[in-house]
């Protein structure tokens, strides 16, 4: 039977006429199709230039893997958010050199510090639609694990051919639930160094209390530099390396940013869920996300308790703590907005209309009916697995996770590279090595034991038919044990392992399967014991995943065709690929507190919020040098008369999500005016349902960053390099 589909460009053409003006995270190749909307919004440059990834400005935008950055000098200097560089700041911090607290500035190139092991910059250079290669006639006829394996095999083949061009990293990304696929090629820069980060009192001002909150006063910026080998090609860290020379970099705005101005953001948004089915929405907000939030809240409290009074422990757990707090508050915001909304009712009504349309013609029913029905039962299977296994990531000791990864490396290395598990091929070994290398700088045994014992006790209290006997046996536990007895058993496991030693872990990367099986290390033994069951679960997930991919892609195709029949827009959910969103600088009336939210905050708000180191957990503790400069009204050229101060953060109608952090916010001339770093708490529900009245993104105003760098931190070298006079 012939498959009917619309290309991404065709979908964009529909969207140009029907989407909300500021809604959508657009692929660069789609932008010429929405040129009229971009021009109407205020873009001065030719929209066609935005589709060329090797031209200005897209050639200046890079992925950090979970965050975005952009080149701002010809010497590979890149700016991103402070919270995106937090892991590298933490990795280089010690109690006697507390970069987290005091900040960091490299006065010379030689002073720039290696970022955390495994840090990368990826510059997207090409995108290719490979849907027909992935979903060829043979693969379309398959289901279950066979389908999953066939898709993975084709992906590996495409990636291997793409990566024959040395120095590049290639990946295949799925769109519309596996209906369409893109092969994305990126230059991989492997030597990344920390150049500058402001003090926590600037870069994290407001802390968790102000996270997802407006008005905001956070200097969320830091600088990296990309380095390459003497031959100009990507290379591992070496003192002989030299700064990378990007073909394009962004320039600071030559004109002031004002309310109502056009802005656009280029970045790598991680994930949205706007095309999810009603049953998925119901499960997410009815059980999964509330449970995740509860568990994360408990983990946050445990980490605080176990590291209290131990600065070394606080530093080691800082990156994990930041991530937990950020996601925890995000989930809370989503839940609060969902509970007071009609999102589920609207999703059900939309799905009922889709099913009625499918059943309204014999041809459509034959084409889509089976997939629509199958998706419902398959999603129910996945939900049952999630309920049983949600605690797994929280209850597993870090050293056991490490041991399982090490043993899997040994198992996969014995196979031909093309047959190895995705993520464990030769191309992945540097990433795996870096993960093992960084563990001890982010591992605190006291805290790790407490987390494991606490959540293992919860797991063992689940109904017996939901427990995995292999997991229970690997720990030497029994159902019904209390936390104290679990802790006693864990003490034996930790004492019987040497994996907390970096040299020991790194040595295991080069050992074979026989060495693992002969080991008496407690966590290595547990990893070996769990291996067969881990593969059983992997095959279970592949079987379900293959069935679900087939059905879900069919549902997405039905959804696309249904909306196309009505002349309505459909764009792909975010999936960590390069996208552009556009909008304008705009406040909100009313805000969540009932007041009018003005589009800009200023330095006055920092002074008003400042509480010092001993109140509010030290989250509102601006540096003394900064407060003195504000009091003296030493504003220089960054003073804005209409604000009678220097702008700090601003609101816009940009459509963004996690992964956009660090993304450059550009004006109509593609000049840098800010860095995207957050959204408002009631608008995080936009990941599931877009509401133009609510959605506001929060960005750092570049004028605040430049004021802090010039007036307080005196980073003259960097300002000169960026061409700031």
Feature-to-residue mapping (PLM):
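Terminal presequence/propeptide segments associated with secretion/organelle targeting
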Residues: 2-5, 10-725
């Amino acid at each position: 039977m012939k498959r009917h589909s619309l290309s991404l460009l065709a979908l964009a053409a529909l969207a140009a006429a029907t989407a909300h003006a500021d809604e959508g995270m657009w692929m660069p190749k789609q932008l010429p199709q929405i040129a009229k909307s971009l021009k109407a919004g205020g873009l001065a440059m030719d929209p066609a230039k935005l589709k060329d990834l090797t031209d200005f400005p897209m050639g200046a935008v890079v992925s950090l893997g979970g965050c975005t950055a952009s080149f701002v000098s010809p010497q590979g200097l890149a700016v991103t958010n402070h919270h995106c560089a937090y892991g590298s700041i933490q990795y280089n911090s010690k109690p006697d050199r507390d970069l987290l607290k005091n900040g960091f500035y490299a006065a010379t190139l030689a002073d720039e510090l290696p970022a955390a092991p495994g840090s990368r910059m990826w510059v997207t250079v090409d995108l290719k639609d490979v849907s027909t290669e992935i979903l060829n006639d043979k693969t379309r006829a398959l289901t279950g694990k066979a389908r999953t394996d066939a898709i993975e095999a084709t992906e590996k083949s495409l990636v291997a051919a793409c990566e024959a061009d040395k120095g590049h990293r290639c990946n295949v990304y799925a769109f519309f639930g596996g209906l369409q696929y893109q092969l994305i090629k990126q230059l991989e820069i492997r030597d990344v160094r920390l150049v500058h980060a402001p003090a926590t009192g600037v870069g994290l001002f407001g802390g968790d209390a102000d996270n997802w909150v407006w008005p905001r006063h956070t200097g969320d910026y830091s600088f990296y530099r990309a380095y390459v080998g003497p031959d100009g090609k990507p290379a591992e860290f070496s003192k002989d390396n030299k700064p990378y020379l990007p073909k394009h970099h962004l320039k600071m705005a030559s004109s002031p940013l004002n309310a109502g101005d056009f802005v656009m953001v280029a970045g790598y948004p991680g994930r949205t869920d706007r095309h999810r089915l009603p049953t998925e929405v119901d499960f997410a907000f009815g059980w999964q996300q509330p449970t995740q939030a509860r568990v994360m809240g408990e983990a946050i409290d445990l980490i605080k308790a176990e590291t209290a009074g131990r600065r070394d422990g606080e530093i080691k757990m800082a990156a994990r703590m930041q991530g937990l707090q950020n996601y925890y508050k995000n989930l809370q915001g989503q839940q609060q907005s969902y509970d007071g909304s009609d999102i589920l009712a609207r999703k059900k009504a939309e799905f009922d209309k889709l099913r009625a349309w499918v059943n309204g013609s014999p041809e459509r029913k034959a084409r889509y009916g089976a997939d629509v029905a199958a998706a419902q039962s398959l999603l129910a299977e996945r939900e049952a697995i999630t309920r049983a296994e949600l605690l797994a990531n929280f209850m597993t000791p870090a050293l056991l996770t490490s041991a399982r990864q090490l043993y899997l490396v040994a198992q996969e290395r014995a196979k031909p590279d093309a047959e190895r598990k995705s993520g464990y091929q030769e191309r992945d070994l540097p990433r795996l090595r870096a993960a093992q290398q960084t563990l001890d700088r982010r591992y605190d045994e006291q805290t790790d034991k407490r987390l494991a014992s606490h959540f293992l006790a919860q797991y063992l209290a689940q109904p017996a038919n939901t427990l995995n006997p292999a997991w229970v046996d690997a720990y030497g536990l029994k159902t019904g044990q209390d936390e104290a007895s679990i802790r006693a058993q864990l003490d034996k496991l930790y004492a019987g392992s040497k994996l907390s030693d970096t040299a020991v872990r790194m040595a295991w990367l080069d050992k074979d399967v026989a060495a693992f099986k002969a080991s008496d290390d407690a966590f290595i033994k547990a990893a070996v014991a769990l291996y067969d069951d881990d593969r059983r679960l992997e095959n279970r997930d592949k079987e379900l995943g293959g069935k679900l991919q087939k059905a879900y892609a069919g549902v997405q195709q039905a959804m696309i065709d249904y909306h196309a029949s009505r002349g309505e827009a459909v764009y792909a959910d975010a999936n960590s690929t390069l996208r552009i969103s556009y909008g304008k600088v705009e406040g909100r009336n009313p805000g969540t507190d009932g007041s009018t939210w003005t589009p800009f905050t200023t330095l006055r708000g920092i002074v008003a919020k400042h509480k010092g180191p001993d109140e509010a957990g030290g989250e509102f503790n601006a540096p003394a040098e900064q407060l003195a400069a504000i009091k003296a009204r030493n504003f220089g050229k960054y003073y804005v008369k209409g604000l009678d101060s220097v702008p700090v953060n601003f609101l816009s109608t940009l459509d963004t999500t996690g992964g956009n952090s660090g993304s450059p916010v550009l004006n109509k001339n593609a000049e840098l005016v800010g860095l995207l770093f957050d959204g408002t708490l009631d608008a995080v529900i936009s990941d599931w349902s877009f509401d133009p009245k609510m959605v506001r993104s929060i960005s750092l105003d570049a004028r605040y960053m430049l004021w802090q760098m010039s007036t307080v931190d005196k980073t003259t070298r960097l300002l000169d390099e960026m061409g700031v006079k």
